[in-house]
Amino acid sequence: MGLTISSLFSRLFGKKQMRILMVGLDAAGKTTILYKLKLGEIVTTIPTIGFNVETVEYKNICFTVWDVGGQDKIRPLWRHYFQNTQGLIFVVDSNDRERIQEGAEELQKMLQEDELRDAVLLLFANKQDLPNAMAISEMTDKLGLQSLRNRTWYVQATCATQGTGLYEGLDWLSNELSKR
């Protein structure tokens, strides 16, 4: 009985913990997104070698967000962060048409990993403020998202430097993860 009351109390008043992995090709805007969410401001970034990890509190949920570098030489290390990941944020530079296929291949490779089979996928279509940014429908097509079966996914248009779309993405993520 005591356990039931305490678990109910923590559900009503406690913060829910969620482990989120944020990956994507280099220069997609992952670190800018992380610190815009954490600090509410733009920070000067350099290419991430390794990872950044921060706790972002939003709507009574503590998201532990792992921002892992995206250079091709360190992508094989991504798999070391897969364990216990509940949500996967894949960040794509909407303006980078030349590398969208490379992004699609990396995403498909990751989604085949057994440790990520239960993770929900949030795709941040970043840099939507740029004039030649791909539309969401075009990105969905080029990334092959329609072919994903047995996977909950969502594409959110974002602009990390302005903060546009970031919290809408977290809303979707928290709603999906709270169903589990």
Swiss-Prot record:
Binding locations of GTP: 24-31, 67-71, 126-129
Q: Which InterPro entries does the protein's record reference?
A: Arf1-5-like, P-loop_NTPase, Small_GTP-bd, Small_GTPase_ARF, Small_GTPase_ARF/SAR
- In this record, residues modified by a lipid of the kind N-myristoyl glycine are 2
Q: What are the protein's GO molecular function terms? A: GTP binding; GTPase activity
Family matches, as SMART domains: ARF, RAB, SAR
Give one GO biological process term.
intracellular protein transport
* Keywords (A to Z) from UniProt: ER-Golgi transport, Golgi apparatus, GTP-binding, Lipoprotein, Membrane, Myristate, Nucleotide-binding, Phosphoprotein, Protein transport, Transport
Q: What does this protein do?
A: GTP-binding protein that functions as an allosteric activator of the cholera toxin catalytic subunit, an ADP-ribosyltransferase. Involved in protein trafficking; may modulate vesicle budding and uncoating within the Golgi apparatus. Part of the ciliary targeting complex containing Rab11, ASAP1, Rabin8/RAB3IP, RAB11FIP3 and ARF4, which direct preciliary vesicle trafficking to mother centriole and ciliogenesis initiation.
Similarity comment text for this entry: Belongs to the small GTPase superfamily. Arf family.
Name assigned to this protein: ADP-ribosylation factor 4
Organism (species): Bos taurus
